[in-house]
């Protein structure tokens, strides 16, 4: 910064201190300007909080959101494609129902019913994914653009206006000690900045129907989601009711006990050593060289997403990096991946 620039900054700071501490009166902006400034400030705060709350509404599990964010960050660092989406609760429920439905098999009522409801839950999770994408594209992204572009630009104009206002008030206070032309130029710059800031705020507030359109897109996306959800649930309800009707119309089977086993006593001494019992000691795990950062698994960890490292309780994992306060990156059996910190105990810490 030039000497003249430093001098101007010093003058502005002097004027600001004299207003805050000394009670000096600065140039007042008109009420219309102040009201527009207030509305723009409220709009800015509303946009930020509504974006945050919308994401929490669509993805209510904070741990899953944090994990998803970490996975996407790691994928970006490694130059990989975007990681998996948010794990919908419907998808997790569907997975459990389908799994146990297969295990029970088709020769009972509960197993096939679990399969039908599990498939419906899977369809619901896909519809929920579509809702997430629709809301992001037509509601969250436009609000983010409004915040990053228009609102940020207005804040820049207001900051510049405040700087020029301080410069003008400082020179006005020194009227008679500085050339009139210098004071006139300061006033012109102040008026110019006020016009630009006023115009940008006016245009934003005048075009707020765009935000109404974005709200409409949010509501329409939810309406479409609930329509599809109702259709899926109605279809599975019909199938379940039909299954109940068929089961009720069939005669109930009676339990038929099988013949009891008879016990035959053998004569003579038993030839089985130790009465047929044997005991095998469990081998101890081989020793591990503790010459590099490593940790011991406290619990089993089953990877749920690409890039995670699975292990069993007692495994010794070589540490390569700490991703954040919740995740490590390490290697086990030649495989590399990341895992939660609270699943392990440190044996040799990573160097700081």
From Swiss-Prot:
Ranges for domain BAR = 18-249
The SH3 domain covers 290-349
Q: Where in the cell is it found?
A: Cytoplasm; Membrane; Early endosome; Presynapse
* Any Pfam family hit: SH3_1
Locate the Phosphoserine modifications and list their residues. 262
Output compositional bias ranges, type Polar residues. Answer: 268-281
Primary site of residence: cytoplasm
State the residue spans of region: Required for dimerization upon membrane association: 60-87
Molecular function (GO) terms for this protein are: identical protein binding; lipid binding
One of the record's GO cellular component terms: glutamatergic synapse
- Any GO BP: negative regulation of MAPK cascade
Query: Which InterPro entries does this chain map to?
Result: AH/BAR_dom_sf (IPR027267), BAR_dom (IPR004148), Endophilin_A_SH3 (IPR035824), Endophilin_SH3RF (IPR050384), SH3-like_dom_sf (IPR036028), SH3_domain (IPR001452)
What CDD domains would the database entry show?
A: BAR_Endophilin_A1, SH3_Endophilin_A
Region Membrane-binding amphipathic helix: list its residue ranges.
1-21
What stretches pass through the bilayer? none
Q: Which family does it belong to?
A: Belongs to the endophilin family.
User: Subunit structure, per the record?
Assistant: Monomer; in cytoplasm. Homodimer; when associated with membranes. Interacts with SYNJ1. Interacts with DNM1. Interacts with MAP4K3; the interaction appears to regulate MAP4K3-mediated JNK activation. Interacts with OPHN1. Interacts with PDCD6IP. Interacts with BIN2. Interacts with ATXN2. Interacts with ADAM9 and ADAM15 cytoplasmic tails. Interacts with TMEM108. Interacts with ADGRB2.
Q: Tell me, what does this protein do in biology? A: Implicated in synaptic vesicle endocytosis. May recruit other proteins to membranes with high curvature. Required for BDNF-dependent dendrite outgrowth. Cooperates with SH3GL2 to mediate BDNF-NTRK2 early endocytic trafficking and signaling from early endosomes.
- Name of the featured protein: Endophilin-A1
* Organism the protein comes from: Mus musculus (Mouse)
């Amino acid at each position: 910064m030039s000497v003249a620039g430093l001098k101007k900054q010093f003058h502005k700071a002097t004027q600001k201190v004299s207003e805050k501490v000394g009670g000096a009166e600065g140039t007042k902006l008109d009420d219309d300007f102040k009201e527009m400034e207030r509305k723009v400030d409220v709009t800015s705060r509303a946009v930020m909080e509504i974006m945050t709350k919308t994401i929490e509404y669509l993805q209510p599990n904070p741990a899953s959101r944090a994990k998803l964010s970490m996975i996407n960050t790691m994928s970006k660092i490694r130059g990989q494609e975007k990681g998996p989406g948010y794990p919908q609760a419907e998808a997790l429920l569907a997975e459990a129902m389908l799994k146990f439905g297969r295990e029970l098999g088709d020769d009972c009522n509960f197993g096939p019913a679990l399969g039908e409801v599990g498939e419906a839950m899977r369809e619901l999770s896909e519809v929920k994914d579509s809702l997430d994408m629709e809301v992001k594209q037509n509601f969250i992204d436009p609000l983010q653009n409004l915040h990053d572009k228009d609102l940020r630009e207005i804040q820049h104009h207001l900051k510049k206006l405040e700087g020029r206002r301080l410069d003008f008030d400082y020179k006005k206070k020194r009227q008679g000690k500085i050339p009139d032309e210098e004071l006139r130029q300061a006033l012109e710059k102040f008026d110019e900045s006020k016009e630009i800031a006023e115009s940008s705020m006016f245009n934003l507030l005048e075009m707020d129907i765009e935000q109404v359109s974005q709200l409409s897109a949010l509501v329409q996306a939810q309406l479409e989601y609930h329509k599809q959800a109702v259709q899926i649930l109605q279809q599975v309800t019909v199938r379940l009711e039909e299954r109940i009707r068929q089961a009720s119309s069939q005669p109930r089977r009676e339990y038929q006990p099988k013949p009891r086993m008879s016990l035959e006593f053998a004569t003579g001494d038993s030839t089985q050593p130790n009465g047929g019992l044997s005991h095998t000691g469990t081998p101890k795990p081989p020793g591990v060289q503790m010459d590099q950062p490593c940790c011991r698994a406290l619990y089993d960890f089953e990877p749920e997403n690409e890039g995670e490292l699975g292990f069993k309780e007692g495994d010794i994992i070589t540490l390569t990096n700490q991703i954040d306060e919740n995740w490590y990156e390490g290697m086990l059996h030649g495989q590399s991946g990341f895992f939660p910190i609270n699943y392990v105990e440190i044996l040799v810490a990573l160097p700081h």
